Each structure stands twice: as C-alpha cells, then as structure tokens.
Swiss-Prot record:
This is Elongation factor Tu, chloroplastic. Residues 81-84 are annotated as: G3. Residues 136-139 are annotated as: G4. GO terms for molecular function: GTP binding; GTPase activity; translation elongation factor activity.
Length: 409
C-alpha cells in the first residue's frame, strides 16, 4: 500500500519574527495568529502561550522556540518566535527553524537598536533570503515625519547588510492594539479596525514579497554517505538519507569529498529491502553504484548531481560558542585552535585561522557564549556550500555550532 501523503492545497512557507528585545515580536506573532485564526484551521495563539516557549534541543544545544501556524488566502505559514535574544542567535545559527523570510519588528517609538542591527547581520550571514519590516507601536508616534525617519534609518541599516532596503515592504501598525481588538472580536474582517487592518496589510505584503521556496525534491540531488558495504556479485552500496532532490536508476552522480571527485552511474536503489526506480528527498536509501570498490567510498563523502557541489577546505562561518552550562568549554579559545568540524555525517579536523567581530576588527580569543565570525582551514576537502550547518567538536562533545557564510577556497 502506498504511504499516505500529508495533503495540503496551499504552498507552505516558513517565516519568523526578528528584532530588538521589547519591540513587540511576540505581540506581533500573537496578533497575526489571532487575526488570521478565522481563516486558519488552527486556533489563534495567545501572547503567554508564545512567550513561554518550550525548550527544544538542536544539535545538542537547548533553544526556546515557539512555533505558530496560520493561513492566508494564498498560503500556509509556519512561524517561529524566540523569547530571548540568545535563543535567536542559537536558532538562526543551528538552523533549528529554517526561515524562508523574516519579519523585522522595529519600534517606531525607539527606532533601530543594537539587536535590530545584530539580527539583520545574522539574517544575512545565515542566509535568510527576504525581510519584510513591521514598524510597531505606531500608535505612540503622532508625527508622520518621525515615522518616515525611522523607516529611513531601518532602510539604511538593511542596505548596509546587502538587503535591498529601498525595495523591502514596510508596514506601520500597532501589534498590541490589533491583538486586543482581535481577541475581543474573533471573527473581525478587513475594514473594521485600522490597527487590525495593518496586520492584514502586513500579511498581504508577505504573501507578495516573500517567494514560495523551491521544494526540496526540485533541488539538485544530494545524499551524505552514512555507511558503505558490498553485495557479492552486485557491487558497492552507499546508504544515507537523501537531503534534497530526487534520483533514478541509471542517473550519473558524483562522489565528492575527502579524495578526488569520481563520477559513477546508479545501478540500483533500495529502501526497506525492496528495490525502487526512484527515490526522493527524505528517503533513507541504499544506492548501488557501478565500478566503485567498497574502499572508494566512506562516511563523510556525499553523492550528488554532477557539478552541483564542490569540495573545499577553507571557509568563513558564523559561529555560536556554547557556554559551560550548555556542555561547552569552560575556558576561551584562541586563533590556531584545532577542533573537529562535524559536517553532515563526519568529523574533519581543521584549524581556526582568524576570528572577526561584527565591526570587522580581528578578535584574539573567543569566550563561551560568544557569537563570532571565523575562518577555518580543514585538513581534507569536503563538500561544503554557503548556508550549510556544522558543529565544532572537541573530544566528541559539541563546543560550538556554526553556519557557512562564505566559501574561500
């Protein structure tokens, strides 16, 4: 019997709220969820349900994240909101909640603040592709010119970090007043309240401006090798979970990482001891390859569509260093530190050549709990790409989490 598919008629998009503490991220999340509850299958989430987010573990790090779902006429959204600033940093770097786009919440009464800047920088570094801005607390600003001034400041900040500041949609409103009105009148529609309308306007902008992401199955094929064995008379099988794309018997693929890249043909696909013609993203499969010895493939290599990914040894990454309480180091580390970089399925030793602070200055050392940009040099080439997540390990325990922000060589 065929596996039951999760049916959904609307395209799905993952978004999240980012911005400075107390500018209204969680209130906005609650307001959107409550205003759209009438159109959505699920009930709206209250502020305190979102604010007391449960702890999750991603790559060995504890993160508090709230997940909210809602629908517009056009799409289904999964929305992530984090209670604390440290949770944002950890969430964005580990990719625990992937974002196809973000809502930058900035208080119109205060203007951009340090974390506004930091979250924009982080969004750039970890590859959040699109941002829409909500200028919150607009009810506290009587002067239209002041509102325009804040909008200009935020635009400049976005442009500074290579987001298209002048194209990004801005909506000014009051999340709190919209939330209070919507709670009092759950089936409120458009045109009934000016603050609730700003929430509808924001969602219209998100529907229009944040593109529907390419589905995992439509991307180029990639599978990280977890195990290898040989079947007498048939050849070598590499097993793993297909990360993206799809693959068929007869396809040409490349074996990448740790050694010279090799090209081969798929002669068979197996899942749960049954052979298949094709396999898709998310499937755990065994891939039988032609003319390859068992000794030619090892854990840590990837099988991928030809030309889609290349091996590298040097990259820049945005890294969060775990605190002692999180099981990380008790002491700082310095340039020249040689940990293991755990990428996809394997550890590769590398040296940290330099640390760079947010302002571009070189840092000598990094303390547990810091976030820093670093340049790493691996001893073996492996398949790496921008946006890929990795862990930094030392003697088998995770001491840092990172994301590749730039390939150097």
């Amino acid at each position: 019997m065929a596996r039951e598919k999760f049916e959904r008629s609307k395209p799905h998009v993952n978004i999240g709220t980012i911005g400075h503490v107390d500018h209204g991220k969680t209130t906005l999340t609650a307001a959107i969820s409550t205003v759209l509850a009438a159109n959505s299958s699920g009930p709206g989430k209250k502020f305190d349900e979102i604010d007391s987010a449960p702890e999750e573990r991603a790559r060995g790090i504890t993160i508090n994240t709230a997940h909210v779902e809602y629908e517009t006429a056009a799409r289904h959204y999964a929305h992530v909101d984090c209670p604390g600033h440290a949770d944002y940093v950890k969430n964005m770097i580990t990719g625990a909640a992937q974002m196809d786009g973000a809502i930058l919440v900035c208080s119109a009464a205060d203007g951009p603040m340090p974390q506004t800047r930091e979250h924009i920088l982080l969004a750039k570094q970890v590859g959040v592709p699109h941002i829409v801005v909500f200028l919150n607390k607009a009810d506290m600003v009587d002067d239209e010119e002041l509102l325009e001034l804040v909008e200009l400041e935020v635009q400049e900040l976005l442009s500074k970090y290579d987001f298209p500041g002048d194209e990004i949609p801005f909506v000014a409103g009051s999340a709190l007043l919209a939330l209070e009105t919507a709670v009092g009148k759950p089936d409120i529609g458009r045109g009934e309240d000016k603050w609730v309308d700003t929430i509808f306007e924001l969602m219209d902008k998100i529907d229009e401006y944040i593109p529907t992401p390419e589905r995992e199955t439509d991307k180029s094929f990639l599978m990280a090798v977890e195990d290898v064995f040989s079947i007498t008379g048939r050849g070598t099988v590499a097993t793993g979970r297909i990360e993206r794309g799809q693959v068929k018997v007869g396809d040409t693929i490349e074996i990448i990482g740790l050694r010279e890249t090799r090209t081969t043909t798929i002669t068979g696909l197996e899942m749960f001891q049954k052979s298949l013609e094709e396999a898709l993203a998310g499937d755990n499969v065994g891939i039988l390859v032609r003319g390859i010895q068992k000794t030619d493939i090892e854990r840590g290599m990837v099988l991928a569509a030809p030309g889609s990914i290349t091996p590298h040894t040097k990259f820049e990454g945005e890294v969060y260093v775990l605190t002692k309480e999180e099981g990380g180091r008790h002491t700082p580390f310095f340039t020249g530190y040689r940990p293991q970089f755990y990428v996809r399925t394997t550890d590769v030793t590398g040296t940290i050549a330099q640390f760079t602070a947010d302002d571009g200055s070189a840092a000598e050392m990094v303390m547990p709990g810091d976030r820093i940009k670093m340049t790493a040099q691996l001893i073996h080439p492996i398949a790496i790409e921008k946006g890929m997540r990795f862990a930094i390990r030392e003697g088998g325990r995770t001491v840092g989490a990172g994301v590749v922000s730039k390939i150097l060589e």
